[in-house]
Amino acid sequence: MKLLTKKDVSPICKNIADEFEGWSYTNSTFKKDIENHSTIYINPLWAMQLSAQPTVVLTNKKVNRLSKILFNETNCWISLKDILAPNATLPTHTYQKLVYTLQEAEDYIRDFFTRGLVIIDNYYNYLDESELLDNMPIDLEGNVGVGYCLSRIIRHDFETARKYANDEIKTIQPKHPWVEQIKSSLPIFEEKYQKTGSVL
């Protein structure tokens, strides 16, 4: 039996997104802008065969600007929350499922999208930028950890950023090499904040 591809299900995803105000499906991911400061995604993270590892991802325009300055990267994930399988017993049981027909695909996609909306309502339901950055779920690992650290700089929480960069805040995996660049740049950002009230 021929397996479906993400191209096959793109029309389904677009139709699902159209049912919910503010949502769109572009570049193989669901997205919605939060006011004019952030974007929330329900990212399927499609596999080659039609399965997904869906997750909720948050980005922020100011963090992206900071990331551009430091790393020349403009799409910095600052928070991540996996969408778990219905029968998940561990936080690592992401909602993965192979599907073979368009109807199976629609049922699966609609289900993980709906579960993603519940996560957003529970954890990211803030229109105010400061509230969102201060209350979003924290993920300290890898690239997302870097993004979280940058979000603390944007919020002028230099102490947390310093502790993360100095490895006083421990992580399971070794910290991303970009952390060294954050560490060396922190005094510059602090000085700029003291002079102008902003790090950007």
Predicted feature locations:
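Amphipathic alpha-helical segments
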Residues: 3-25
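Intrinsically disordered, low-complexity regulatory regions enriched in serine/threonine/proline
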Residues: 2, 31-200
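Long, charged, glycine-rich C-terminal linkers/tails
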Residues: 26-30
